[in-house]
């Protein structure tokens, strides 16, 4: 991660950290870096979610893009994966999404996509950061016909919706509850599932700029669970603010997280011979029960660091077509280049329809182990070297020995804070408490600051 770019673009409190001035510079410098080798006038697609700060940042970002001669196609409110899809299929030079995903309304972010629909490589982000930190802006300043033009492009939303529908099945007879988080999915999810002939009920469909992700959506599925009870729906589908995540709820009101969703889709593809290298890519946070379920089906897995960015890198490098995270980011590379909540929802409901199974039946093969995570404040200089402390290494080895393969321990540094995270999974809550508390006590005694 660089000075400005984190693992998912540039983020911060809108108008405080992520200011219009910074958005203008990101548009100007980012647009230049991504289009400097174009032989024709470059085109960049820009979209946003429903945050109140979105239009402010959109205006500033677009001004920056126009100032270096880029033609900007303004998509308005659209899901992040919709930008990725349109950039790739319409052969644009780049795409930009203004969103802070599942974060609250006061935050916002700016995320770039290259012409291939993938997030930027580290080298491209560093090139943009170098221009941001330069003492003087030496980029060209065209005038008159050299300036970029702005094109309103509402057709982009319709094209993305039609794409989603083409990947699905006729859902006649399936009753679906949707939670669009008062975010980007609020303009599209209803249309997609109506076009698929589903019987739908929708909440979180009335954004006011401030209520995105506010007690609703994939990080707060409680309201969707209540709606499932009220409507006796077959499945509930909850998206986050920019609709790159999906969390589902089964007909009994139980949460079906990213691990279970990946398993359901992966098993379906594997049985059809369509799972590339019969492998799913996941992160170190995926539950041990997910791994055991894959083993029982003969499906292989590759494990990366936390973050859908690293999952996608692994998939691209080795040619896998399914990966994701426990949090609900699911990447189905046969269709799109980034996590896509609505695409995942369409595939999940298609599998229900084709198999005739309920969501609880499809998810029942994954037994989620109890999990506990404790954050311990440590000095930044020590969080990367904790495993070098003999007492810490010894207690972890001791706990792993007691588990005898029927559990998992993960001790890792936070990527953004002076914290060491201690996580364990085991068959019972009592065992999890024992493993985590024992390790945490040693960590606090050796390097803890509290």
From Swiss-Prot:
The protein's UniProt keywords, in alphabetical order, are: Isomerase, Magnesium, Metal-binding, Phosphoprotein
Modified positions (Phosphoserine) are 101
Cofactor or coenzyme needed: Mg(2+)
Residues binding Mg(2+): 101, 240, 242, 244
| GO BP of this protein | carbohydrate metabolic process; peptidoglycan biosynthetic process; UDP-N-acetylglucosamine biosynthetic process
User: What does the note accompanying the cofactor annotation read?
Assistant: Binds 1 Mg(2+) ion per subunit.
GO annotations of cellular component type: cytosol
Report which reactions are catalysed by this protein: alpha-D-glucosamine 1-phosphate = D-glucosamine 6-phosphate
Q: What is its EC number?
A: 5.4.2.10
GO molecular function, a single term:
phosphoglucosamine mutase activity
**Catalytic residues identified in the record:** 101
How is the polypeptide modified once translated? Activated by phosphorylation.
Function text = Catalyzes the conversion of glucosamine-6-phosphate to glucosamine-1-phosphate.
UniProt record similarity statement: Belongs to the phosphohexose mutase family.
Under the heading PANTHER family, the entry gives: PHOSPHOGLUCOMUTASE (ALPHA-D-GLUCOSE-1,6-BISPHOSPHATE-DEPENDENT), PHOSPHOHEXOSE MUTASE
The protein in question is named Phosphoglucosamine mutase
What is the organism field in this record? Streptococcus equi subsp. zooepidemicus (strain H70)
Q: Which gene encodes it?
A: glmM
């Amino acid at each position: 991660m660089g000075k400005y770019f984190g693992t998912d673009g540039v983020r911060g409190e809108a108008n405080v950290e992520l200011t219009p001035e910074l958005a203008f510079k990101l548009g100007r410098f980012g647009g230049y870096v991504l289009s400097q080798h174009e032989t024709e006038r470059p085109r960049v697609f820009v979209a946003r979610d429903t945050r109140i700060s979105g239009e402010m940042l959109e205006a500033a970002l677009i001004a920056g893009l126009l100032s270096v001669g880029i033609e900007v196609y303004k998509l308005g409110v659209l899901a992040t994966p919709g930008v990725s899809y349109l950039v790739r299929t319409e052969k644009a030079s780049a795409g930009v999404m203004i969103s802070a995903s599942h974060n609250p309304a006061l935050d916002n972010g700016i995320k770039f996509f290259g012409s291939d629909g993938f997030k930027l490589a580290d080298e491209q982000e560093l090139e943009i950061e170098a221009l941001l930190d330069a003492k003087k802006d030496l980029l060209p300043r065209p005038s008159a016909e050299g300036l970029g033009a702005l094109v309103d492009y509402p057709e982009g939303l319709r094209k993305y919706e039609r794409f989603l529908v083409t990947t699905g099945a006729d859902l006649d007879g399936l009753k679906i509850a949707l939670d669009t988080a008062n975010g980007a999915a609020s303009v599209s999810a209803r249309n997609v599932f109506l076009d698929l002939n589903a019987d739908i009920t929708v909440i979180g469909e009335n954004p006011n700029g401030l209520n995105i992700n506010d007690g609703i959506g994939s990080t707060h599925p409680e309201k969707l669970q209540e709606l499932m009870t009220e409507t006796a729906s077959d499945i509930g589908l909850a998206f986050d603010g920019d609709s790159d995540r999906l969390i589902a709820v089964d007909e009994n009101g139980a949460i079906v997280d990213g691990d279970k969703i990946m398993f359901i889709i992966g098993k379906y593809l594997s049985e059809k011979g369509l799972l590339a290298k019969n492998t799913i890519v996941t992160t170190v946070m995926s539950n041990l029960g997910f791994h055991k379920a894959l083993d029982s089906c003969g499906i292989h897995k590759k494990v990366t660091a936390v973050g859908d960015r690293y999952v996608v890198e692994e998939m691209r490098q080795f040619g896998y077509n399914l990966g994701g995270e426990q949090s609900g980011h699911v990447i189905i590379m046969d269709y799109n280049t980034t996590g896509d909540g609505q695409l995942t929802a369409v595939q999940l409901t298609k599998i229900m329809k084709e198999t005739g199974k309920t969501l609880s039946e499809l998810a029942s093969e994954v037994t989620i182990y109890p999990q506990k995570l404790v954050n311990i404040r440590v000095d930044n200089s020590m969080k990367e070297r904790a495993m070098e402390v003999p007492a810490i290494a010894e207690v972890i080895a001791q706990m792993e020995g007691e588990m005898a393969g029927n559990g998992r321990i993960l001790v890792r540094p936070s990527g953004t804070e002076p914290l060491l995270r201690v996580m364990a999974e085991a068959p019972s809550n009592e065992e999890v408490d024992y493993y985590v508390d024992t390790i945490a006590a040693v960590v606090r005694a050796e390097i803890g600051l509290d």
